[in-house]
């Protein structure tokens, strides 16, 4: 894929296959790449990116069909997004990095780690649906973005970071990406992943069933599954301190033994230089 730098009035971007990819980056240090999910854009990662920017170079992009990235595509599928992320990393000189993905972003991250193991050092997959059985069935049949958004907010207050991005989504992006993930059986993908894999679920998530954490742990995948009991579909916004502490601890994980020892800490304090 050929990419060229792009500078809009107030944003950074790349042209990949003649399609704009908007991204933002904070901080200096080792890279971490954050990938958003079905609803919203890069913006809801800002609080976590800011916390980690003290000692990492944090990146997040708008996937095609979302935010300020290109919306001219007729199809939005996981494998195309995998190639998009690889091209994005290539153009920014990121050879290998941890991936932190949410729902759609979690599916992309796990698929990418299985296909390109040399490019990923570890994966945090947040609210990862293993297959269609773990996705709220109403999401699979709701058509418009507005109808889907109402399902997301049935049991929790909308977040401004997410709500502000809704008008910018392609009219069919949410439905098509939900269907794309639902067609996959990610249990097969997880068996191919060799790097540390942490899955995180919200215990009160109305969108992705958190009970699959038991299946992940019970079937001895090379993964650790942790449930944040009071979180819903956006754990990074519902419980930001616990989520950030968990991610910080995960960044230090190098072995399977360390991965299994991970647990949720009650407090997280920002490190100082």
Give the predicted meaning of each segment.
Residues 19-70:
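Conserved HGGG/HGGXW glycine-rich cap/lid loop of the alpha/beta-hydrolase fold
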Residues 36-38, 97, 101-106:
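Conserved alpha/beta-hydrolase "nucleophile elbow" surrounding the catalytic nucleophile
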Residues 59-100, 245:
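Active-site loop/oxyanion-hole signature of alpha/beta-hydrolase fold enzymes
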Residues 107-115, 119-151:
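Flexible "cap/lid" loop of the alpha/beta hydrolase fold
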Residues 135-195:
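Conserved alpha/beta-hydrolase catalytic His-Asp/Glu region
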Residues 193, 199-201, 205:
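Short beta-strand/loop motif that positions the catalytic acidic residue
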Residues 206-212:
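Conserved alpha/beta-hydrolase "acid-adjacent" motif
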Residues 224-273:
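Catalytic active-site module of serine/aspartate enzymes centered on a nucleophile-bearing elbow/loop
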